Amino acid sequence: MQNHVISLASAAERRAHITDTFGVRGIPFQFFDALMPSERLEQAMAELVPGLSAHPYLSGVEKACFMSHAVLWKQALDEGLPYIAVFEDDVLLGEGAEKFLAEDAWLQERFDPDSAFIVRLETMFMHVLTSPSGVADYCGRAFPLLESEHWGTAGYIISRKAMWFFLDRFAALPSEGLHPVDWMMFGNPDDRERMPVCQLNPALCAQELHYAKFHDQNSALGSLIEHDRCLNSKQQRRDSPANTFKHRLIRALTKISREREKRRQRREQLIGKIIVPFQ
């Protein structure tokens, strides 16, 4: 298995974390230098996802994250690889990860390398819907189909045909059709034309920040993209036409009823959903 870890060349602490996390398990890996806002990023967007450059809401860091995955896929396709495992540099690995990542016979026995598929290795501790896939369990972990949104791109295996699918799709979409890369890959299943995504359960990996949040702990590594998204979201709210005194007053007066309705909707949305554990 070729394991690629997307990481800024300057991220010494995170690279040390990855070297220790993968090394102690004897898992081979290679760093892929993540993009940041730069001329290189602009060139990559122009070549692969031209609609992304003019996107009005995604920040430069979000665009760089998006393109880091896209450029890595293009590299894998140029090298003729049938599939790759992709990780981000704040990932935590679960028990027996080496049985999945230091070898790939299990993958070839369960998936056709010439088909379009993704094996999602990560959990974000969200409530998600899954359904049986018919894929045999391996080392105590199941491969149900993901039938709902499940954000995050900290760990996944993607086949050559799936990489082609997303790159072709991204290249054709206008700015308004593009969203953060994890939304594009693991958002509404209809948006990816029902391409099969198998959600490993229990999950093999988790992002350190979300693992810490789920367990009410302090994050040791943090997340640049999460911080950037938060700032970007606040700026959008400030710039919104709805951010007037009249609208703010109406929202304040209707807050209780809106909260009740949100709780009711959340209860309905959680029916049949599970939180994929990490172990």
UniProtKB/Swiss-Prot annotation:
It comes from the Bacteria. Pathway: Glycan metabolism; lacto-N-neotetraose biosynthesis; Bacterial outer membrane biogenesis; lipooligosaccharide biosynthesis. The keyword Flavoprotein does not apply. One of its GO terms (molecular function) is glycosyltransferase activity. InterPro entries: Glyco_trans_25. The keyword Glycosyltransferase applies. Pfam families: Glyco_transf_25 (PF01755). GO terms for biological process: lipopolysaccharide biosynthetic process. Its EC number is 2.-.-.-. Keywords: Glycosyltransferase, Lipopolysaccharide biosynthesis, Transferase. Transmembrane segments: none annotated. Adds the second galactose to the lacto-N-tetraose chain in lipooligosaccharide (LOS). Belongs to the glycosyltransferase 25 family. This is Lacto-N-neotetraose biosynthesis glycosyltransferase LgtB.
